[in-house]
């Protein structure tokens, strides 16, 4: 949501040239969680876990804002990636959008160019997951071609360095076919971002084993660690971490990490 940073909304003609250039050059627009409207902290006393748990789903507000943008009707190939937002919330979001069009459309005058909200979403939006079995189980409601895997490296939500094992566990639990696994792990990304590392490097150099060997030879430590191997003072405490404490941390006050 650019208005959070003092810019015009995505519905303003201010951005028309950007949409045009992105569409002409097949550039995906990445809408990352937290870059615009962040989910509010319920209170300073609320355990920070509550905020972390709800954070990915906060992107639904941005998804709704963009889905109702008439600029999507001008550019059939414009793609928006809902980065780090997960997938599980999407089926109900689309169901609600369908209900809204049928129930409120006569007075809201929403314009989907004769299409349904779900149809427009599948044409223009990409969803990204780190760990989201519920979303994968409902892939038919989202569109398998709209789901991409990510690992969030190097942030705290990342499953690195055990990302391959963690990801395969999810895909295996859900029962994705080999074709579907290839789609969500790399083919969808290659297609939409127009970047094919397999073609550039060779498939034999893009396997988990090959990449881990490259890391080993480069002296990269891929052992599982907490805090990157450093001693984090904020973990040397008893009691629950609250929203207020974390807000102070990011403001440069209170607890710090070495």
Regions found by a protein language model. Name each.
Residues 152:
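Active-site glycine-centered loops adjacent to acidic/histidine catalytic or metal-binding residues
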Residues 69-70, 78, 88-89, 107, ...:
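Mid-to-C-terminal alpha-helical segments outside catalytic/metal-binding sites
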Residues 120, 124-126:
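Aromatic- and acid-rich polysaccharide-binding/catalytic face
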Residues 1-120, 133-145:
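Histidine/acidic residue-rich metal-binding segments in metalloenzymes
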């Amino acid at each position: 949501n650019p208005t959070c940073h003092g810019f015009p909304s995505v519905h303003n003609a201010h951005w028309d040239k950007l949409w045009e250039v992105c569409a002409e050059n097949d550039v995906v627009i990445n809408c990352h969680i937290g870059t615009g409207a962040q989910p509010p902290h319920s209170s300073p006393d609320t355990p920070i876990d509550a905020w972390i748990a709800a954070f990915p789903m906060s992107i639904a507000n941005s998804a709704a804002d963009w889905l109702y943008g008439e600029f999507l009707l001008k550019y059939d190939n414009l793609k928006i990636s809902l980065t780090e937002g997960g997938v599980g919330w999407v089926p109900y979001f689309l169901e609600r959008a369908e209900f809204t069009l049928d129930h409120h459309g006569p007075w809201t005058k929403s314009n989907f160019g004769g299409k349904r909200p779900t149809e427009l979403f599948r044409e223009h939006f990409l969803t990204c997951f780190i760990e989201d079995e519920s979303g994968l189980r409902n892939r038919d409601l989202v569109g398998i071609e709209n789901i991409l895997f990510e690992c969030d490296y190097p942030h705290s939500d990342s499953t690195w360095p055990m990302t391959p094992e963690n990801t395969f566990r999810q895909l295996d639990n859900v029962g994705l076919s080999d074709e579907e696994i290839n789609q969500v792990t790399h083919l969808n990304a290659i297609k939409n971002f127009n970047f094919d590392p397999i073609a550039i490097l060779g498939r034999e150099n893009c396997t988990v084993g090959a990449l881990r060997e490259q890391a080993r030879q480069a002296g990269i430590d891929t052992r599982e660690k907490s805090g990157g191997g450093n001693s984090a003072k904020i973990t040397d405490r008893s009691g629950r971490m609250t929203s207020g404490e974390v807000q102070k941390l990011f403001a440069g006050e209170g607890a710090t990490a070495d």
